[in-house]
């Protein structure tokens, strides 16, 4: 069945919630760092963040403000309840809580038995609207932990694969959907999933969520199908304050990295960049429909009332999210023959006109139809924008980068594990020749291949060792083996050593010196100088300067670079590029 869709633009709605003081903070003399400065006729509000110690203050415009005295049910009545009727008309909606650890995100989404949060309130409303109708309600509940997805409703932890279907829509392979008929039945199922979610004690929170949790409610009727996603994001953490070690430090690094990827996506959408980095993390991949996609999205920014620096970081990202526009589409199950296009036939006709029928015949026996249709449908939607573009096509055009890529990248590396049939070399040789005439290569994406994207799941959770390129290996060799002549006095101190030992010692000293110089540079350089480094962009440079305001030397070892969202592999890659630049 094809779908008929009516599309409209809808910006992401951003509201701010300031949690009340905790019992442990009741005796604190600190005044809240955030307050409502004023409201505007169009519905906007202006909030002010003020640091009582430094007298710094910032002002931001948002869609709504809920202070410490506001209850969660007020947020639901004013913000969330408005998106629920649209689900019964075939649209999707997403509500997600964002903020630092300990800012009240999980309480906002889950609530308590006496004061239910947004999740139980939403389920109760959906079930009430389904009463006396033929609607069926199903739920799923899963978490993103250490860049892997796990089903929380299964007795045994089962990893979920994040895939794209032939139309480019996100699919979660292996995710269980459980029918729900009453609120009591929901609470019984949901409570089991909550107990399975990863939580742990940290220096800032006794029960800190160590994963992003997603509850999806799917409504199906004879005519339409809609979905509501309710997401409780894990909070970004400052490991200097949490004193995390071991596995907690690894979890924190993954959480910070995924939230940094989220800020990159929002920044790219605001700047209308041709390529949106959704695939930088599993979190941004799952939120792709909610940010710049085809879902109605509500972002609830949660704040700790006494943490100024955390509040600035949270609200600045939230304010930028307001400028992100989604493309809402209401899909109904109606046959629309005019929108059906046999893209395989169009490709064959074009190849025949160019005298390349032999290549397409070889592809027919080896590639699935989905592998061809996905990129071609994107191209066709771009070329026929005057009349045949659906809501999905317009969303793809906003994303930009995808519809400019070569069908099959001849320079791409295709791992052997993605192919499990004979004749794979013929596929690679053949597909190097097949390039659509109206498409141009995308220089930013040199490691991906359309063929790989069509045949395999996303690779954000691949083994980092497998993702290392030959260039990176060469960088490591340069870093360890080449040495300036001026450092020969270091080698002279190695007494009784063979020439090889001296050579290895020379490389080791050079490496340690480079690392220390790099850390010293991060501790003193200004914003413009930081941005000249490989791997340091504007946002990361700003965050480094923020860290230096709290501590004069925030970077004492390579592990401290995890505080700015860098993984160990990214740190290694940056040092490799730095070393390469020295020898050029």
Curated annotation (Swiss-Prot):
Pfam families referenced in this protein's UniProt entry, alphabetically: HHH_3, Kinesin
Entry keywords, A to Z: ATP-binding, Microtubule, Motor protein, Nucleotide-binding
Coiled coil regions, renumbered to chain: none
UniProt-listed Gene3D superfamilies: AF1531-like domain, Kinesin motor domain
SUPFAM superfamilies: P-loop containing nucleoside triphosphate hydrolases, RuvA domain 2-like
InterPro entries for this protein: Kinesin-like_fam, Kinesin_motor_CS, Kinesin_motor_dom, Kinesin_motor_dom_sf, P-loop_NTPase, RuvA_2-like
Source domain of life: Eukaryota
Ligand binding (ATP): 99-106
GO annotation (BP), single: microtubule-based movement
Chain ranges of the Kinesin motor domain: 11-324
GO molecular function, one term: ATP binding
Disordered: annotated segments: 377-398, 445-469
GO CC annotation: cytoplasm; kinesin complex; microtubule
Family affiliation: Belongs to the TRAFAC class myosin-kinesin ATPase superfamily. Kinesin family. KIN-10 subfamily.
Protein name per its UniProtKB record: Kinesin-like protein KIN-10C
Organism of this sequence: Oryza sativa subsp. japonica (Rice)
């Amino acid at each position: 069945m094809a779908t008929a869709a009516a599309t409209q633009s809808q910006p992401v709605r951003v509201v701010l919630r300031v949690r009340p003081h905790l019992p442990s903070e009741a005796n604190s003399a600190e005044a809240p760092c955030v307050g409502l400065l004023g409201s505007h006729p169009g519905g906007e509000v202006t909030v002010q963040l003020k640091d009582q110690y430094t007298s710094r203050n910032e002002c931001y415009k948002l869609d709504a403000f809920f202070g410490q005295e506001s209850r969660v049910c007020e947020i639901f009545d004013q913000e969330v309840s408005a998106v629920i009727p649209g689900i019964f008309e075939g649209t999707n909606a997403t509500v997600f809580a964002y903020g630092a650890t300990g800012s009240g995100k999980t309480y906002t989404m889950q609530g308590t038995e006496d004061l239910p949060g947004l999740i139980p309130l939403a389920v109760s409303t959906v079930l009430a609207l389904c009463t006396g109708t033929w609607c069926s309600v199903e739920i799923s509940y899963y978490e993103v932990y250490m860049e892997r997805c796990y089903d929380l409703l299964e007795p045994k932890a089962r990893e979920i694969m994040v895939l794209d279907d032939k139309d480019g829509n996100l699919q979660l392979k292996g995710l269980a959907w459980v029918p729900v008929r009453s609120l009591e039945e929901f609470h019984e199922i949901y409570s089991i999933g909550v107990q399975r979610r990863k939580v742990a004690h940290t220096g800032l929170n006794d029960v800190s969520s160590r994963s992003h949790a997603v509850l999806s409610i799917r409504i199906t009727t004879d005519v339409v199908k809609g979905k509501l996603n309710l997401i409780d994001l894990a909070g970004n953490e400052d490991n200097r304050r949490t004193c995390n070690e071991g596995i907690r430090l690894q979890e924190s690094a993954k959480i910070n990295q995924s939230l940094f990827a989220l800020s990159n996506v929002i920044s790219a959408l605001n700047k209308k960049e041709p390529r949106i980095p959704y695939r930088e993390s599993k979190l941004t991949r799952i939120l792709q429909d909610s940010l710049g996609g085809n879902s109605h999205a509500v972002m609830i920014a949660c704040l700790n009332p006494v943490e100024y620096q955390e509040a600035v970081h949270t609200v600045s990202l939230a304010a930028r999210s307001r400028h992100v526009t989604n493309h809402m589409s209401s899909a109904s199950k109606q046959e629309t023959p005019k929108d059906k296009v046999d893209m395989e036939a169009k490709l064959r006709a074009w190849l025949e006109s160019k005298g390349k029928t032999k290549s397409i015949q070889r592809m027919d026996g080896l590639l699935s139809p989905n592998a061809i249709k996905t990129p071609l449908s994107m191209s066709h939607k771009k070329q026929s924008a005057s009349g045949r573009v659906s809501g999905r096509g317009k969303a793809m055009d906003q994303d930009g980068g995808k519809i400019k890529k070569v069908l099959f990248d001849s320079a791409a590396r295709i791992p052997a594990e993605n192919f499990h049939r004979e004749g794979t070399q013929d596929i690679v040789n053949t597909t190097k020749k097949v390039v659509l005439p109206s498409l141009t290569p995308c220089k930013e994406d040199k490691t991906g291949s359309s063929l790989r994207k069509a045949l395999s799941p996303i690779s954000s959770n691949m083994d980092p060792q497998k993702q290392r390129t030959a260039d990176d290996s060469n960088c490591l060799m340069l870093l360890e083996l080449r040495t300036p002549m001026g450092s020969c006095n270091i080698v002279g101190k190695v007494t009784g050593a063979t020439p090889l030992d001296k050579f290895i010692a020379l490389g080791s000293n050079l490496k340690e010196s480079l690392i220390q110089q790099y850390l010293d540079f991060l501790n003193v350089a200004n914003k413009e100088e930081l941005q000249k480094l490989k791997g340091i962009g504007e946002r990361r440079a700003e965050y480094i300067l923020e860290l230096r305001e709290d501590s004069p030397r925030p970077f004492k070892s390579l592990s401290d670079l995890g505080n700015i969202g860098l993984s160990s592999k990214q740190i290694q890659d940056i040092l490799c590029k730095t070393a390469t630049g020295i020898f050029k």
